[in-house]
């Protein structure tokens, strides 16, 4: 995606452009910074800088749906089993229906206090759990079907940056493998 919110699909081998589409918010200033994108077998899901998730067809870049979010995202959505999971700057994670874009559930994590790194980590998703990192240093394991809490942990106390500024953000994608989860915080 370029600075004008134009997203291009290019051939991997030749660089030939297959399609280009605008994924910003129509009628708004184009200076917002987006979060990222992910894909399944048929669609591309973009968290743009305008507090929206946009679903496009991979084949031609046609917009399938566009969902307004209650706050901006600064991470790529995670897609698995017909759900799109997106973390928001205000400490929420949402599960969206991948086919239609409606919100299935919302979980509000601990936002925390102090300074923040202006970005977020994407959630890690398995068949059984959504591992959601939050700016407060909280890591929550949620049930993918309804967002119910399986467990939570607070990974780090706030780190003093100097003066009164403190930060405790989780900035790396949690890794899930062989029945364990590993996450890094600031």
Language model: regions and residue ranges:
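Extracytoplasmic beta-rich repeat domains
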Residues: 17-38, 63-80, 103-127, 152-178
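Structural signature of WD-repeat beta-propellers
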Residues: 2-3, 32, 48-49, 88-89, ...
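Mobile, glycine-rich extracellular loop/lid and propeptide segments
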Residues: 9-12, 38, 45, 85, ...
């Amino acid at each position: 995606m370029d600075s004008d919110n134009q997203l291009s699909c290019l051939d991997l081998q030749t660089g030939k452009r297959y399609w280009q589409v605008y994924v910003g918010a129509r009628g708004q200033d184009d200076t917002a910074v987006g979060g990222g994108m992910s894909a399944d077998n048929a669609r591309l899901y973009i968290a743009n800088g305008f507090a929206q998730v946009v679903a496009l067809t991979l084949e031609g870049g046609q917009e399938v749906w566009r969902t307004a979010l209650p706050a901006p995202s600064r991470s790529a959505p995670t897609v698995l089993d017909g759900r799109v999971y997106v973390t928001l700057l205000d400490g929420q994670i949402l599960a969206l229906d991948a086919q239609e874009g409606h919100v299935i559930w919302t979980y509000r994590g601990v936002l925390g206090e102090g300074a923040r790194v202006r970005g977020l980590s994407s959630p890690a998703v398995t068949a059984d759990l959504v591992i959601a990192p939050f700016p407060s240093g909280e890591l929550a394991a949620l049930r993918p079907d309804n967002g119910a809490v399986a467990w939570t942990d607070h990974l780090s106390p706030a780190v003093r940056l100097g003066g009164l500024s403190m930060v405790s953000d989780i900035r790396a994608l949690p890794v899930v493998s062989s029945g364990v989860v590993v996450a890094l915080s600031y």
